[in-house]
Regions:
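PLP-dependent aminotransferase-like
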Residues: 95-153
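PLP-dependent aminotransferase class I/II
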Residues: 204-288
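Conserved PLP-binding catalytic core of the aspartate aminotransferase-like
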Residues: 131, 270, 281-313
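N-terminal small-domain helix-loop-helix segment of the aminotransferase-like
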Residues: 2-84, 91
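PLP-dependent enzyme catalytic core of the Aspartate aminotransferase-like
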Residues: 167, 309-313, 318, 322-362
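Active-site phosphate-binding strand-loop segment of PLP-dependent enzymes
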Residues: 131-189
């Protein structure tokens, strides 16, 4: 039988978002900013205690929400749990964005902002980070005069690693009195900065967080939206009653119950960022200051060939050549052994070429 489905034009106009390739588990995964050292052993112990009865019940949220609110330093009514960080972003479109209304992003950045915007039928305004990967603060402030519904800011930004300072952020919030400001803090733990203390001062501010990075729980899909209680009550209307599964709640509670594990991971990431940047600089590779668990590097025109060689040897990186220029790559800070293995192969396989972009050091 031949039928014609009444598909929305916004869906027809875009391609399917392709998830990472299968078969990554036995590779050196330096491509998606996962915690390759793994979650706390306490998480596995907690998950092992789940019973058939637990699995048969719909999840209950009061106690997990109270515990996670304490972790973030907010009240339970200021916290909304979501099915991963991606879902934390989607709910802003369901709440605030109508077809043909405008949102603003600064690129290169996390692609899901544009993804959800296009599905919602929104008009996407896109500014560019400067050549040195600095945030375009003047252009953002000017754009806020143009009837924007939502401004999305990744802080630190993915993939540049840029951290926007408190002064700049406050300037934005003081101007954005009729615009929702979403601060995506997926990598906040690696930056020593968060806007969470500001949520009661600025009702238009929402902070999105995830347990995929520092807690090492990417497969369980747990995110959070945090904002002042009155504003968050509106967002809550756009959420289903059971957005998060019990296993994710149990795992998150166990992870935050082992803060030493997360602190050690953050300290190791910070150490590796400095060391890897220094080693790459000595090879003539430009890197950019990063406040995330990754580095952005520029290998120039011979970079893509190197990345393919590394993939063939089981080391996965996130090639950003298509949207940033040939040779740009984002490198997750894995374990010390993984980073030594990466640098050893780069020294062996990379053949530098004449540079189109000038080399600068951090």
């Amino acid at each position: 039988m031949k039928v014609q489905l009444p598909v929305r034009q916004a869906i027809l106009d875009r391609r399917t978002y392709e998830a990472p390739a299968e078969g990554r588990s036995d590779k050196v995964r330096l491509d998606f900013n996962e915690n390759t050292s793994g979650c706390s052993p306490a998480v596995r112990r907690a998950l092992a205690k789940l019973t058939v009865k637990h699995l048969a019940m719909y999840p209950e949220y009061q106690q997990p929400t109270e515990r996670l609110a304490r972790y973030f330093g907010v009240r339970p009514k200021e916290l909304l749990l979501t099915n991963g960080g991606d879902d934390a972003l989607r709910v802003f479109f369901d709440t605030f964005v109508e077809p043909n209304t405008s949102i603003l992003i600064c690129e290169p950045t996390f692609p899901m902002y544009r993804y959800w915007a296009e599905i919602a039928g929104a008009q996407v305004g896109a500014l560019r980070y400067r050549a040195n990967m600095q945030f375009p603060i003047a252009e953002v402030l000017e754009s806020l005069r143009n009837n924007l519904r939502v401004l999305f800011i990744a802080n630190p930004n993915n993939p540049t690693g840029t951290l926007i300072g408190e002064k700049e952020l406050r300037c934005i919030l003081e101007v954005a009195t009729e615009t929702v400001v979403v601060m995506d803090e997926a990598y906040a733990e690696f930056s020593d900065f968060t806007a969470l203390p500001w949520i009661r001062e600025y009702p238009q501010l929402f902070v999105a967080r995830t347990f995929s990075k520092v807690a090492g729980l990417a497969s369980l899909r747990l995110g959070a939206v945090i904002g002042c209680a009155d504003s968050l009550a509106l967002v809550r209307r756009a959420m289903p009653p059971y957005p998060v599964n019990l296993a994710a709640l149990v795992a998150a509670a166990a992870a935050i119950g082992d803060p030493g594990r997360m602190r050690a991971y953050v300290a190791e990431v910070k150490r590796l960022r400095v060391w890897v940047a220094k080693e790459l600089c000595e090879l003539g590779v430009r890197t950019y200051p990063s406040a995330g668990n990754f580095l952005l590097a520029d290998f120039g025109p011979t970079g893509p060939a190197l990345f393919r060689k590394l993939e063939g040897k089981g080391i996965l990186l996130r090639d950003r050549s298509k949207d940033m220029g040939s040779g740009f790559v984002r490198i997750t800070m894995g374990t010390s052994e993984e980073m030594r293995q990466l640098l050893k192969l780069i020294r062996k396989e990379w053949k530098p070429a004449a540079r189109v972009r000038p080399l600068q050091t951090n």
